[in-house]
Amino acid sequence: LVPESSLFMHQSEDYETEVYPVSFTTEEMDATHKQLKDGLFLKQPDWTEYYVNIMRFVNFTSIHLRGCENLLENQPLMSRMRGMGFDIVLTDPFFPCGALVGNIFSIPVVNFLRGLPCGLDMKVNKCPSPPSYIPVPYSGNTNIMTFPQRVINMAMTVVESYQCSLLYGHYDEMVSKYVGNNMDYRTLLSHGALWLIRNEFTLDWPRPLLPNMVLIGGINCAEKKKNASLPADLEEFVQGSGDDGFIIFTLGSMLPDMPQEKAQHFLDAFRQIPQRVVWRYAGDPPKGLPKNVRLMKWLPQKELLAHPKAKLFLTHGGSHSVYEGICNAVPMLMFPLFAEQGDNGLRMVTRGAAETLNIYDVTSDNLLAALNKILKNKSYKEKITEMSQIHHDRPVAPLDLAIFWTEFVIRHKGASHLRVAAHELNWIQYHSLDVFGFILLILLTVLWVTLKCCLFCTRRCCRRGTAKTKSE
């Protein structure tokens, strides 16, 4: 299902698509997207803008919720789909459309995702997340924390709960409208049959998982080939780099360009290195383009990373790009912009396979220093090669694993046997507070009885002593 107005979703010859009308235009979507990304190159976000950024995100998601309503209110399309007898809904739970369709059609839902804001994917699955060693997103902590860091991490769990209520309040309204029974988005998501999570522990910190959560990090990777299939002119350009090799630079599909002043900082640094640079840049070409830099509105990222002459990957740190870098053992210089990208950068830096720079204060000098540091220090290549070997050393490839479990849910019409009983417990029962209370009551009762017995015995002894004294 594809909305007729979309920035990134389009029809494809590889599968059948159904385009449904929506009440907004692509221009409106582009405007909300622009509002979300404006300012990324200007200054570092601070705590004073925390609420403002959340509201921008809410505005960004609101237009997609309108699209969900347009789909659910399209009775001819919904009736036709119901009659087609679908076996499963495969959806990204970032928006509620897929989960709502699955509930309305009474068919299993398989969620396909990297993660949800404020860790909602873990919360709705009742997956244990002890703050003592699992860092809260955006906290800047690793899985090994000092006492002050654990205090901050614990405090941020409270902030995270507040963030959840802001982000998903309008989701709850939509779920209540179309499902009823006072159901909220958390409850709806908790009935998902399976969760295909685009992550795994080569990149992520070790943590508990539940049986209905399957890690498929690297599903988008292409196997590294000695002769990557590149267009002839691009192959000639990268081969011309000689032993120095070339650099791939892209900030993802959401940011195809940047302010001219910022672009000049990159060009000033690139002209001082011997490597050639392939840069995905869809804006107006910057002035004074060096001979070793080639701009492309679109570039074959997988094939370039798989090329034997690829030396460095300049990326925003999105999970797809990071895993493609890991799969092909290419060190990274990361410019985290939003979402999980900062945490991805922290993980890669901690593992010694990357460095990070802030896009808003990058200059030609600090960029050149970072480029030379990674290109001239062999440890980055050694670390990313080790990560790549670990990532590939698995019994089942991520794509095959995702296919198996999706077909499993289809064959068995769900996976209810993987759903933990924690969903049936309230907060007090889940944390065994009623058990602790019962044990405490028993202990207090025993203590009270013991105390009463001691007092009784003491009084009896005192009375006997008094009677004996009087008789004497």
UniProtKB/Swiss-Prot annotation:
Name the reaction it catalyses.
glucuronate acceptor + UDP-alpha-D-glucuronate = acceptor beta-D-glucuronoside + UDP + H(+)
Q: Which CDD domains match?
A: GT1_Gtf-like
Compartments reported by the entry = Microsome membrane; Endoplasmic reticulum membrane
Which SUPFAM superfamilies does the entry link to?
UDP-Glycosyltransferase/glycogen phosphorylase
Uppermost EC category: transferase
Q: Mostly located where? A: membrane
Q: Which PROSITE patterns match?
A: UDPGT (PS00375)
Listed under GO cellular component are: endoplasmic reticulum membrane
Keywords on this record? Answer: Endoplasmic reticulum, Glycoprotein, Glycosyltransferase, Membrane, Microsome, Transferase, Transmembrane, Transmembrane helix
State the Pfam families in the record. Answer: UDPGT
Tree of life domain: Eukaryota
- Molecular function via GO: glucuronosyltransferase activity
| Membrane topology listed for this record | Single-pass membrane protein
Going by the UniProt annotation, this protein carries glycans at N59, N227, N377
Q: EC number(s)? A: 2.4.1.17
Q: Where are the transmembrane segments?
A: 436-456
**Transferase in keyword set:** yes
Job description of the protein: UDPGT is of major importance in the conjugation and subsequent elimination of potentially toxic xenobiotics and endogenous compounds.
Family to which the UniProt record says this protein belongs: Belongs to the UDP-glycosyltransferase family.
Q: What is this protein called?
A: UDP-glucuronosyltransferase
Upper taxonomic classification of the species? Eukaryota, Metazoa, Chordata, Craniata, Vertebrata
Encoding gene (name): ugt3
